[in-house]
């Protein structure tokens, strides 16, 4: 019985064949459940209209198992529209109550990904959600005037005879003028230069090394973005550890700064990679074979086979994850707006600046089936050829596994320490030399416990990533010093107990998750974000069906930048928002 329970949980987690027992109904808009993810306002004052808006796509995805991609010609904002900030709005409606499967979606312009998102759970009366994202940093692609540029939305799903729901998706872009009002909660710091560049991306004649100094901060807009994506322009589907996706790129020799931005999501057997016990445990206990790779995954990026950066992804819990009742109507961190990850390639420009093709390879260490990954290479151009030298040293890594188990009870601990330090020298045509040193420390700790004959699963995980960038001139004087610190703790417990009657169990669940990020310049914090989630609840489960569920979800969000602060606190009880307070008081 107990072993069965564990298998049940593993099945719940790994096969995702959860079906809802709700009925088919198509109800009016007013009754539709409105889902949302906590974030700070992207527009300071909702009364201030955008300078202009463009509706890019209206499409109804019907059978998304055969037709996952929808592509139209991209419509840029009118050239007369004055703007400094672009906000992408993705709205979706689902009219069916049956599909409990989470679907992942992405939005691309000219194969450059702008948003990775996932679907909300359907409810009896249908559901509705809207995602807004500041996409200003993609300005070079947003302003493209080439009328054959593609605009694509992909919605990937499992579909079968029982899942007849349709997704209606509308995507728009709203453009706001920075100068028209104070923009207190901009997610972009110091981007005035970026704004100037916005409108004339191909004429960079006036740019010299002066710009190289002032423009370093991460969120200034790149002059060019090169997609590192699948053949058809979309995500790479990575099936296993040896599945290496390669793209050839040849970059402009005027490049003085490059950042690779990765979009990553895990699905199928890999959706709950952080809750995976090692092979030895699953084998000895005769559990579902091949599904016990342990809880370490890392996305590796190489240039011509040389490792240049890695990402240990932050778990994103989809809307039917762990306990579906948790995520109604407030979803988990990143469910609607997946984080993307930056790898600074500036110190590695010496590997790329020779007018030749270079191979950028992406793979998932210990990865199984499947991961959806792609990348955007953001490139900043100077006015003349840049010479670059790299002192290449591969990142170092230490991994420690500590496994101990007897029968179904056990403790599995993994600790990974990854550190890298790269120094690159770039010299502009004018002879100025700038040295960029990027050091990064990644720390991953995953402690997984199976107790009480495997009926109690406890996870305690922490991911920490600290990046330092130091820029110096030819005489060794500091020009800039940036530091980014991110911490992502996650605690999950799942306790399964038999209920009266055959095959029925109660499953008690908790999820405590945090996202904490800060960005500082010369030790002054320019931007900080703190998002806490605390959910507790239980479900009554029969086989693979959830019969009923109850939940409490508390979330706190705090954001601060050079212009102001924003905080919001939301409490949800059994799917009803019982408290929702926000203010703009700064907490020291
Ligand atoms: C959802 O809407 C589509 C199109 O309007 C309709 O064909 C379909 O029957 C609806 N599905 C349900 C479950 O109501
Ligand atoms: C939802 O719509 C269906 C038919 O469209 C209707 O029969 C049903 O009563 C509605 N449900 C509720 C709870 O109003
Ligand atoms: C989407 O629908 C709206 C309202 O019907 C329409 O004004 C708009 O042109 C449509 N957009 C596209 C891209 O078809
Ligand atoms: C969706 O496509 C699949 C695969 O072609 C097919 O088996 C299924 O019947 C289709 N479902 C609907 C509702 O059309
Ligand atoms: C898939 O969608 C495209 C429009 O994006 C449509 O032209 C095509 O007929 C669809 N194919 C199938 C098999 O439904
Ligand atoms: C999309 O646009 C159409 C036409 O304007 C509208 O009828 C529909 O309600 C919109 N859907 C969503 C999800 O906003
Ligand atoms: C669906 O709509 C009906 C009618 O407004 C309402 O009574 C019912 O509670 C709604 N169901 C859900 C799950 O929100
Ligand atoms: C695209 O632009 C070219 C040149 O400006 C023009 O000839 C062509 O008709 C345009 N195509 C579309 C679909 O607007
Ligand atoms: C659809 O639902 C029926 C009844 O619950 C079930 O017997 C059948 O296996 C399901 N089909 C699929 C493809 O899941
Ligand atoms: C890994 O996945 C690729 C792509 O699906 C496949 O061709 C290859 O056979 C797989 N390798 C292993 C060892 O499973
Ligand atoms: C990349 O370039 C290499 C050598 O230049 C070539 O052999 C390879 O086929 C190219 N790969 C792709 C995917 O274009
Ligand atoms: C989470 O919330 C529960 C009550 O719902 C509380 O007992 C617990 O201490 C909270 N945990 C954290 C880490 O805040």
Task: Please provide the spans of the model-predicted regions.
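Cleavable N-terminal signal peptides of Sec/SRP-targeted secreted and luminal proteins
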Residues: 2-21
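Intrinsic disorder/low-complexity detector
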Residues: 4-7, 213, 221, 582
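A generic signature of intrinsically disordered, low-complexity regions enriched in glycine/proline
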Residues: 6-9, 195, 223, 227, ...
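Beta-strand-rich ligand-recognition modules
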Residues: 19-58, 63-70, 76-79, 91-210, ...
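Extended extracellular/luminal ectodomain segments enriched in beta-structured repeat modules
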Residues: 78-89, 251-259, 267-270
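Flexible, low-complexity coil/linker segments
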Residues: 159-258, 385-419
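C-terminal beta-rich recognition modules with glycine/proline-rich loops and embedded aromatic residues
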Residues: 412-434, 438-440, 450, 459
């Amino acid at each position: 019985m107990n072993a069965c329970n564990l298998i049940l949980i593993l099945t719940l987690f790994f096969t995702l064949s959860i079906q809802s027992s709700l009925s088919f109904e198509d109800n009016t808009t007013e009754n539709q459940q409105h889902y949302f993810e906590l974030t700070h306002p992207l527009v300071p004052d909702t009364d201030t209209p955008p300078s202009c808006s463009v509706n890019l796509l209206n499409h109804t995805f019907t059978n998304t198992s055969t037709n996952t991609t929808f592509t139209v010609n991209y419509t840029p904002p009118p050239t007369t529209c004055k703007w400094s900030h672009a906000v992408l709005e993705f709205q979706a409606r689902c009219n069916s109550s049956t599909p409990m499967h989470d679907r992942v979606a992405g939005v691309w312009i000219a194969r450059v990904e702008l948003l990775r998102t996932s679907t909300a759970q359907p409810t009896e009366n249908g559901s509705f959600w809207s995602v807004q994202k500041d996409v200003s940093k993609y300005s070079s692609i947003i302003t493209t005037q080439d009328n054959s540029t593609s605009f694509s939305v992909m919605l990937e799903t499992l579909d079968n005879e029982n899942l007849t729901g349709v997704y209606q998706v509308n995507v728009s872009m709203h453009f706001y003028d920075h100068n028209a009002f104070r923009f207190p909660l901009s997610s972009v710091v110091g981007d005035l230069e970026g704004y100037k560049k916005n409108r004339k991306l191909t004429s960079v004649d006036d740019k010299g090394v002066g710009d190289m100094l002032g423009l370093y901060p991460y969120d200034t807009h790149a002059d060019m973005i090169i997609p590192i994506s699948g053949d058809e322009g979309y995500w790479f589907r990575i099936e296993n550890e040896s599945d290496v996706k390669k793209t050839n790129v040849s970059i402009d020799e005027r490049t003085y700064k490059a950042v690779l931005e990765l979009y990553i999501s895990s699905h199928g057997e890999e959706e709950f990679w952080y809750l995976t016990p090692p092979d030895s445990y699953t084998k000895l206990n005769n559990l579902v074979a091949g599904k016990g790779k342990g809880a370490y995954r890392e996305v590796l990026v190489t240039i011509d086979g040389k490792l240049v950066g890695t990402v240990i992804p932050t778990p994103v819990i989809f809307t039917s994850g762990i306990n579906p009742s948790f995520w109604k109507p407030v979803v988990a961190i990143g469910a609607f707006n997946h984080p993307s990850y930056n790898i600074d390639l500036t110190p590695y420009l010496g590997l790329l600046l020779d007018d030749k093709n270079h191979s950028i390879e992406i793979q998932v260490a210990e990865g199984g089936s499947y991961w959806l990954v792609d990348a955007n290479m953001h490139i900043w151009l100077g006015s003349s050829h840049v010479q670059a030298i790299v002192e290449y040293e591969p990142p170092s890594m230490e991994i420690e596994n500590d496994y101990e188990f007897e029968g179904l009870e056990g403790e599995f601990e993994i600790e990974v320490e990854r550190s890298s330090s790269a120094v690159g020298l770039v010299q502009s045509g004018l002879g100025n030399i700038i040295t960029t040193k990027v050091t990064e420390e990644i720390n991953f700790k995953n402690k997984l416990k199976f107790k009480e004959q495997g009926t109690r699963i406890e996870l305690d995980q922490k991911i920490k990533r600290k990046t330092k960038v130091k820029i110096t001139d030819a005489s060794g004087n500091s020009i800039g010093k940036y530091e980014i610190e991110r911490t992502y703790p996650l605690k999950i417990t799942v306790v399964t107990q038999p209920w009266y009657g055959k095959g029925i169990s109660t499953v008690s669940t908790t999820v405590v998750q945090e996202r904490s990020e800060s960005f500082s310049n010369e030790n002054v914090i320019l931007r900080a974000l703190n998002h806490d989630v605390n959910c507790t609840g239980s479900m009554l489960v029969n086989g693979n069906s959830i019969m009923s569920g109850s939940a409490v979800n508390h979330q706190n969000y705090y954001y601060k930048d050079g212009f102001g602060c924003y905080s919001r606190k939301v409490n949800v009880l059994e799917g009803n928002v019982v408290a929702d307070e926000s203010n703009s008081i700064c907490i020291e």
